């Protein structure tokens, strides 16, 4: 089962998770357990191996408030043997120097603590100046969504990215619990 953990202040991330990402996983036959960041406990990380993490970026490259409050603890978690796919929301035109920096902030901590990051996303089709979320010149560490300027692309981007995540699961697991 996939564990999907995320934070959301304005409900944009929550809406994308509930109305788009979770239904896409269900349609693919993948069981997903979702939780908001304030609901997490240490067992949520210890007892599972495959995670999808969602983070909107705020203001000038800052973490969303739940992630910000949790981040000092997050940086202490041992992610060796854990697989993580990331997605983030940001505003590539209004905050073009910090586009989805939250993804990069999480990625840095995850890599430092042994996680394997999967399902990077191409930078093609975005217009921004800088981002901490860049894995390399052509890829973000995870899916980049812009509900402010490219909301019309959210569903198709999520659809393509969820297919990548499902393929990654298929390559790792002998059986995926089916959604009920």
Q: PLM features: residue spans?
A:
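Short acidic/polar alpha-helix capping motifs at helix-coil junctions
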Residues: 4-6, 35-38, 70-73
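FMN-binding flavodoxin-like domain, especially the glycine-rich phosphate-binding loop
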Residues: 27-28, 47-180
